[in-house]
Amino acid sequence: VVGSLKSQGDMPGGIVALSAGGTIKWQYEISESVSSTPVIDKDGHILFGTERGNFYILDANGTDAIAVLDVAGAIANSESAYASEWAATQGKFWSSPVVDADGTIYVAITNTQDESKSLLVALSSKYVKGLPTTGWPMRAKDAQHTATVK
């Protein structure tokens, strides 16, 4: 089981993995809060967004960030029609990412300036190859959010 941590005071945020018995297997700490459920891809990488607009891809052991994408900054500095309404530090991931079969990552990001504008962003990374064919790799089980067990 992999879950998220909110940063509070001196306590860091990040991701924690628990064994079936509830003991901590590992913890990846960052100085940002994580409000969404992480996703696990085909190779076991752990993907999540933060409340500062950064998107992390951790190795399967949860020990190293193999990619950190500044999505809020990329929107603010893009040629997009939305760029003028964003600042590099004004993005927050509240929703859980979804990864499709070809490895495209879909996630909603909210402008924290007034929290009235959100965008659905499609991300790609050479590290993400798709979803596992078994298990429960993301919130509500799959990209369709069926939340069913057969």
Language model segments and positions:
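Extracytoplasmic/lumenal domain signature
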Residues: 1-150
